[in-house]
C-alpha cells in the first residue's frame, strides 16, 4: 500500500566522534507539501538532509524516502530527488545554458528533450537574458534561480533545499518562494531548511531542531497555538527601563525589544499577562501601553528552545 508520506524517518541519528549531530529524529513529511526545518546553525538541519539524500550514512535509525529505505538502495533514489546545496555549487566557468545542459546529461534526460526543457526553465526562472552569461558573474539572486532550475530539471518528485535563501535580497527571497509554491501545487514535495522565521511561517508544516533534537513540529498555526505562552506587546517612552523592570520578573521568560516596543513572553499558567506587566511597570513608575497579541514564529522558537534547554539541565 502506497504511503501518504514522501519521507518517514525513525530514530534517525548521526554522530561525528563524540558529537551527536542528530539524535533519534522522527519525521513524517506529507507528499506535495513544503516541509520546513527551522533551527540555528549547528542544529542538525544539513546533516539530516544529507542522510535523507543518501549522502551520509546514519549512525542509527533509518528513513523511507519515496518508498526507498536509506541507508540501503540510495542509487535508485537519486533520479527521484533534487538537491540544492547551501553554497552555490554549479560551474562558474560555464554559461547558464551550459550548466543546465550538463545537468540534463548527468540525469540522462533524452537528448531530444534537452532544448525544450532548458528553454522552459530559462523562461520559468527568468534567466533567458542570462543564458549566455558565465555563472560566476551572476548576482546572488540569479545564481539562486539557476541552482533551483538545475535541481528541478529532471522533474524530481522530492526536492531538498538547504538554506537556499541565505545570501539573497528580500525580493529574491519572495520570488524564490513563489516558485516553491508553484512546484508544490504541481505535486513536488519540498523539504527546506531555514533560520528565517518568516520563511518558516510559509511552510505547510515544519520541525524545529535544537542541538540535533526535534523539539516541536506541526503546522505554523498549530505551533503558534501550542506555545504555552502568553505574548504581550509593551509600548513605553523609556523602553530600556521597561525592559529592565519586566526582565526582572520571575514569571517572564523573554523580553525582546523591537524599536520602541517590547515583546514579552509569559507562561500561560501565570494568569492575566497584561495585568502582570501593568503592575510591574506601575511599580517602577513607568507609563506604558500594553496589549496581548498572538504568538509569532519567533515566539514559538524561543519558547520551545528554552523549554528544551530547561529539560537538559
Predicted stretch roles:
Residues 61-72, 76-77:
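Conserved ABC transporter NBD signature motif
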Residues 93, 134-138:
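Conserved ABC ATPase signature
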Residues 101, 105, 110-130:
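Conserved ABC ATPase "signature" region
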Residues 148:
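Hydrophobic anchor residue at the start of the ABC signature
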Residues 159-162:
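Catalytic Walker B motif of ABC-type/P-loop ATPase nucleotide-binding domains
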Amino acid at each position: 500500500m502506497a504511503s501518504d508520506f514522501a519521507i518517514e524517518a525513525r530514530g534517525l541519528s548521526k554522530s561525528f566522534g563524540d558529537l551527536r549531530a542528530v539524535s533519534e529524529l522522527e519525521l513524517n513529511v506529507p507528499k506535495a507539501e513544503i516541509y520546513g526545518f527551522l533551527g540555528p546553525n549547528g542544529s542538525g538541519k544539513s546533516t539530516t538532509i544529507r542522510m535523507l539524500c543518501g549522502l551520509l550514512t546514519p549512525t542509527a535509525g533509518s528513513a523511507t524516502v519515496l518508498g526507498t529505505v536509506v541507508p540501503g538502495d540510495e542509487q535508485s533514489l537519486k533520479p527521484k530527488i533534487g538537491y540544492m546545496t547551501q553554497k552555490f555549487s554549479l560551474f562558474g566557468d560555464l554559461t547558464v545554458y551550459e550548466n543546465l545542459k550538463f545537468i540534463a546529461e548527468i540525469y540522462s534526460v533524452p537528448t531530444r528533450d534537452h532544448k525544450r526543457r532548458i528553454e522552459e526553465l530559462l523562461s520559468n526562472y527568468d534567466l533567458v537574458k542570462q543564458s549566455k552569461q558565465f555563472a560566476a558573474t551572476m548576482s546572488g539572486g540569479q545564481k539562486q534561480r539557476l541552482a533551483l532550475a538545475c535541481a528541478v530539471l529532471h522533474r524530481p518528485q522530492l526536492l531538498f533545499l538547504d538554506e537556499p535563501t541565505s545570501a539573497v535580497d528580500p525580493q529574491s527571497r519572495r520570488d524564490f518562494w513563489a516558485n516553491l509554491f508553484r512546484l508544490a501545487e504541481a505535486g513536488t514535495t519540498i523539504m527546506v531548511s531555514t533560520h528565517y522565521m518568516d520563511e518558516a511561517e510559509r511552510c505547510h508544516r515544519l520541525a524545529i531542531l535544537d542541538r540535533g533534537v526535534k523539539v516541536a513540529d506541526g503546522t505554523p498555526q498549530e505551533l503558534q497555538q501550542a506555545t504555552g505562552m502568553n505574548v504581550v506587546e509593551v509600548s513605553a517612552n523609556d523602553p530600556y527601563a521597561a525592559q529592565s523592570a519586566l526582565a526582572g520578573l520571575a514569571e517572564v521568560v523573554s523580553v525582546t525589544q523591537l524599536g520602541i516596543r517590547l515583546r514579552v513572553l509569559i507562561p500561560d499558567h501565570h494568569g492575566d499577562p497584561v495585568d502582570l506587566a501593568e503592575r510591574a511597570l506601575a511599580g517602577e513608575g513607568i507609563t506604558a501601553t500594553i496589549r496581548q497579541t498572538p504568538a509569532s514564529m519567533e515566539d514559538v522558537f524561543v519558547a520551545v528552545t528554552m523549554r528544551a534547554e530547561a529539560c537538559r539541565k
